[in-house]
């Protein structure tokens, strides 16, 4: 018995962005998964909204610079209203070296100065809300840019420091540590580990410029709760969580070399994969839900979670993110 299901559909495309209708799978398989029987007091508006995705750098240039910007989105708000959409979803607009289209974030609480300012962002939020349009932003919690101040501090501080504990650093193998800690390849190709000047290696499951956070570090938890509150305080209505099935990792085990992680063919259904879809990740999202619920109305969220279908419902529980993309 399935209930409350809406699959991800690309309803239309145009030169500015794309409209996504019903982006969520709002709890599945009630009989197979008893925990899915939990019900929130009200269904999230995100569950069946028409949502228009915007890549800010190519949407609308308000200055003639040749680059789209936040003010350009505000200028197009009447157009967006005429489409009949209910929300806009902004791809990353944060300061970034743009190694991965903005998903390498150098500052989680600011606007890339090439795109405008926080004042421009506030104006855009106000223009959207006066038209009844909600605003969703991307959050990238699995990794940062290597230009983030935290990672620069980690490199400067050295092995065993609190600064380095925010990321996944390990000693190498071999007589002189010259071999990476595991044999993994990254999702975008090449080794998943890069060696730094003092001989340690750091993990990056995407590009070398995107070091993975260590979510066993309490400081990382506190930081992202603050990030969510920062944007919620500015009026953001919802969050799309990038690589939501990542974050929690277990590198203290003896079988790491057997996992062919880049091929994506080693997903398991019991939450014990060393890197992806671990059971511990749900503790993070329950923590985030407490942040969302401090607001009236509560902030909404949706997980980008590439997981086995039978585990999608875990991310969509009302005491966690509430929705998840359905990639099947």
Predicted regions, residues:
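N-terminal polybasic/positive-inside topogenic patches
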Residues: 9-16
């Amino acid at each position: 018995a399935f209930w409350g299901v809406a699959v991800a559909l690309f309803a239309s495309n145009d030169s500015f962005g794309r409209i996504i209708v019903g982006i969520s799978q709002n709890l599945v398989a009630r009989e197979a998964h008893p925990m899915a029987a939990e019900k929130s007091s009200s269904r999230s508006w995100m569950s069946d909204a028409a949502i228009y995705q915007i890549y800010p750098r190519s949407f609308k240039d308000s200055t003639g610079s040749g680059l789209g910007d936040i003010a350009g989105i505000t200028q197009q708000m009447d157009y967006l209203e005429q489409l009949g959409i209910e929300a806009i979803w902004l791809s990353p607009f944060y300061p970034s070296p743009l190694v991965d289209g903005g998903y390498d974030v150098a500052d989680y609480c600011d606007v890339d100065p090439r795109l405008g300012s926080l004042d421009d962002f506030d104006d855009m939020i106000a223009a959207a809300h006066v038209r009844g349009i909600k605003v969703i932003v991307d959050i990238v919690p699995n990794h940062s840019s290597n230009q983030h101040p935290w990672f620069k501090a980690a490199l400067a501080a050295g092995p065993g420091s609190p600064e380095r504990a925010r990321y996944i650093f390990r000693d190498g193998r071999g007589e002189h540590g010259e071999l990476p800690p595991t044999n993994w390849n990254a999702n975008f190709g090449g080794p998943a580990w890069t060696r730094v000047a003092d001989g340690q290696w750091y993990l990056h499951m995407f590009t070398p410029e995107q070091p993975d956070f260590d979510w066993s570090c309490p400081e990382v938890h506190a930081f992202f709760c603050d990030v969510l509150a920062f944007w919620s305080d500015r009026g953001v209505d919802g969050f799309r969580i990038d690589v939501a099935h990542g974050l929690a990792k277990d590198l203290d085990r003896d079988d790491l070399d057997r996992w062919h992680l880049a091929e994506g063919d080693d997903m398991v259904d019991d939450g014990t994969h060393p890197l992806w879809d671990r059971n511990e990740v749900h503790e993070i999202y329950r923590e985030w839900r407490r942040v969302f619920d401090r607001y009236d109305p509560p902030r909404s969220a949706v997980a980008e979670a590439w997981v086995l279908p039978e585990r999608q419902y875990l991310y969509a529980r009302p005491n966690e993110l509430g929705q998840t993309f359905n990639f099947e």
